[in-house]
């Protein structure tokens, strides 16, 4: 019941065991279980990132969150229209984050990484806050209620063009879950607030081993 991630220029013919297919074109959409991130590949060539598992995958939807899962892994995604005030966008992201954890808990899984694609990532509001700020604030509200320690998932945040916010995550049934920090770096949640207005909350990496596998995996931020 393993997971294998690889790049290919052709869509797989057999999709029963595919938990995610990510396409690199300059628009955000989810059609026929293929996710487009708003980023295009070098030379605009057809490139697909395929997440293949060793057992069958089912698909469902919860509160506008698309879910693909099997006995070991769960992939979920949400697309949010980038409209409204700072507080409205922050609340929308906060609600999706809360739903991510509700879905994962109901499936007895732990989120190991969350990816974010935000339009106008460093757009400045009147109070000098940015779209990255609102993401950090929304995430902090959820994490303070969910985590009693600093065992946050890994994360990626990328700025894109367009008017849609994309957030997706990977969760797993974890026999072991351990966060990894880089001793040569200040941990994100310890950034000095007199220098950084944002308070990112993520781990540099997460190592985990699923219940049905003997191999430990490491998933990194960035």
Description of each model-found segment:
Residues 1-115, 122-222:
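N-terminal presequence-like segments and the immediate start of the first folded domain
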